[in-house]
Structures are given as structure tokens and as C-alpha cells.
Amino acid sequence: MKNCFIFSGQGSHRPGMSLNLYNTFQIAKDRIELSNKILGYDISEIMFSAEENVLRQTQYAQPAIFIHSTILFDLIKDQKECVAVAGHSLGEFSALYANNFFDFETGLKIVDVRARAMHECELNYPGKMSAVIGTSIDKIQSICDSVDCQIANINSDSQIVISGSEESIDLASKSLKNIGSKVIPLSVSGAFHAKLMSDAKNKLIDIINTSRFNEVCYPIVSNFNAKPNISIESIKDALIEQIDNPVQWSKSIKSLSKLSSEFLEIGPKKVLSNIIKKIDDSLTITTYNSIENL
């Protein structure tokens, strides 16, 4: 059966990521050494040796996850048939590499611009994110509107992530707890997929509009609208819009499940499988995150 390939996003990093791949496969060694040249700094040192508090920083985590995910994809692509792709936030860029939308160098350059721009927003507009469990999206939206924060991820019907300034998230969290919600602060460094990322969006527009893209091989279900996209222009627009709009993950999985019930999760860590099972427990999910899975 053909598979839906899905790629994890920021938060799926892990110290030592890609080191075993680098030491085992020539394609991994070549890819990582090329990445050092493209980025202009030693990303391999950060991936292989950096502590968690360094690797998790947006400007390093995003390129590192993209590099790792694309290596894994290239190692398994001839073994599995694909019917469609998707990625969670940053993972959408790995999905587009797998879909022939851009070559590796183009993809990494775009991811680097995105990561640096988002990191700059983190510094200029401090914010945070929290997961909300067990409350309807309508109630969450109403509270967010009242304190000026946003819904950032709709991961499943029972897990919604909110994003905004530190003050607005504190106020929203208090109100949500008062109505019985479980609120879990996330270990992230900024207010992703919210209007505090609007400056980063402008920088992403510039590089996307000056980059070369190819026709895709399969539909990509985009975070922004959860619809299968195949046209270059619609894919570009969705990439730009997702940076300060909610990740429609639950709807994306439901859209993909119409194409196949077999999913492959690709990324440094198993993070999407449990979320997907909460959306539709009939789906079969295989994870590729390290050399042990190959």
C-alpha cells in the first residue's frame, strides 16, 4: 500500500542527532558537510555535541531537524511508495523536499532564513505557548480573543495550543483553568504561529519569492488550509501564511487519511504518532527517526 509521509517540526530535536547516520552513510556525511558550507557555521558540531539548551534554540533547531529529516527520507525513499506528504510546521519544508518542490540547498537556505527571522521575533517580542487539554475550541477561541492571544496548533479535538505574549498567555491560562481546562506550558522560546511572528513572515516572503521551485510529485496537505495542494503558487502561499497562522494538524490528518491509512513519520524523534492516533486510531503509523529504524 502507498504511504502518507509526514515530517515532524520544531521540538523533535535531540542531542547527538545524526551522528550515527554521519558515521554510517556517505549520503549523510556529504549532506551534513554541505550544510556546514551553506549555513556558514558548523551545524554538525551543534547537532552532534551541543547541550539541549543550545540545540533547542530556534536558529539551530530548525536547520538541524530539516537536515536530519531529509537524510532519513533519502535513505528510505526507494523502499516505500508515497501517495501524499505533510509536515508539522517546520516539517512542511522537509515534506516539500521529499516532494521535489526544491532541492536540498534551496530548502536549507529558506529554512535558515525562517529560523533566523523567527529567532529575531523571539528576542523582539517575547512570548510563550501552552497546550490546552479537554476544552472545546470555541471556548478556547473566546478566551484567546478576550486577552489578545491566538490559537496556534489544532493538534486534535482534545489538544489545542495557544500562543501569544507572556502576559496574554498567563491571563488565558488562568481563565482556562477556572473553567476546568488542563493547561500545560510548552518548552519553547517564542510565540510561534501567532501575530508576534509577523516580522518573520515578511522575511520569508522575500526568499520564497526569489527562489526556484519545481512541480510536486504528490499532493502536499498544507498546515495553513489542510487541503491537498499541487500548484506551485498555492504551496508558496501556504508556506508564507503558516508562520503566523494556526497549524491545522487535525484537519490535515483527516485529509490525508482519505488517501491512505498507512503513515510514515520521519524526523529526529517520535512525536506525531501519538497525536495522530488521537485523531484516528485506525491509522497505521511507522516511525523512522534514527539508524535503528532503517
Predicted regions and their residues:
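Short, hydrophobic/aliphatic alpha-helical segments
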Residues: 1, 76-78, 177-180, 252
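NAD(P)-dependent dehydrogenase/reductase Rossmann-like domain
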Residues: 207, 212, 246, 258, ...
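A short, acidic, amphipathic alpha-helical segment used as a generic capping/interface helix at domain edges
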Residues: 244-260
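Alpha/beta catalytic cores of group-transfer enzymes, especially the acyltransferase/condensing modules
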Residues: 10-12, 39-41, 100-244
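Glycine-rich phosphate/pyrophosphate-binding beta-alpha loops
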Residues: 61-63, 191, 246
